[in-house]
Amino acid sequence: MLDRFLPEFDRALRAVAGITRASRPNPADAIVAPTDDGAKLSDTERRHAAGLMRVNHVGEVCAQALYQGQALFARDPAIRAQLDEAAREEEDHLAWCAQRLQELHDRPSLLNPLWYAGAFAIGALAGRLGDKISLGFVAETERQVEHHLDGHLDRLPEHDARSRAIVAQMRDDEVRHGDNARAAGGIDLPEPVRQAMRLASRIMTTAAYRI
């Protein structure tokens, strides 16, 4: 267990501190250069876009924590490898959101350590309950994240092409993660659990938009 805990602890520190590096190119770089669309945003639009991207950044901090907690207690090595691979892609999302926040002259959430700790505890609990439940938790989480990102694509300023490109790629990745979890044997979670997850998500997104 210790040989897995130490690398995960290092990853946790990097996620909370925002010291992450993407393994894939930022999808926004294929759309428009960083300085090109900033002038098109009013100050109100910039603050709104930054609030949404801060929420997305928090979501990726939580995703890192959830996957790390689940992988730590996964019983099947193949499931652990699947969770680790998804976490690496989520780390790309984390780096892209952090870069976009810098471009929008804003900052990540001040509550990131709290978000991470809570999400890790939930992920560890899901992992301890068994791989099928853990995968079901992944599938339901990604389904809710997909819905959340669709909403952000509707709410982002129309001409904020860079944020839109990042969110669109994140959405595609989340859909795939959810499909993979279901294909690997994830079970449907009870409705009260799904409702509790939605409530927790609303609390997080409301706070992260501002703080």
UniProtKB/Swiss-Prot annotation:
It holds the Pfam family COQ7. The keyword Cell wall biogenesis/degradation does not apply. The keyword Oxidoreductase applies. Fe cation 1 binds at E60, E90, H93, E174. Binds 2 iron ions per subunit. GO terms for molecular function: 3-demethoxyubiquinol 3-hydroxylase activity; metal ion binding. Pathway: Cofactor biosynthesis; ubiquinone biosynthesis. InterPro entries: COQ7_proteobact, Ferritin-like, Ferritin-like_SF, Ubq_synth_Coq7. Catalyzes the hydroxylation of 2-nonaprenyl-3-methyl-6-methoxy-1,4-benzoquinol during ubiquinone biosynthesis. Belongs to the COQ7 family. This is 3-demethoxyubiquinol 3-hydroxylase. It comes from Ralstonia nicotianae (strain ATCC BAA-1114 / GMI1000) (Ralstonia solanacearum). The gene is coq7.
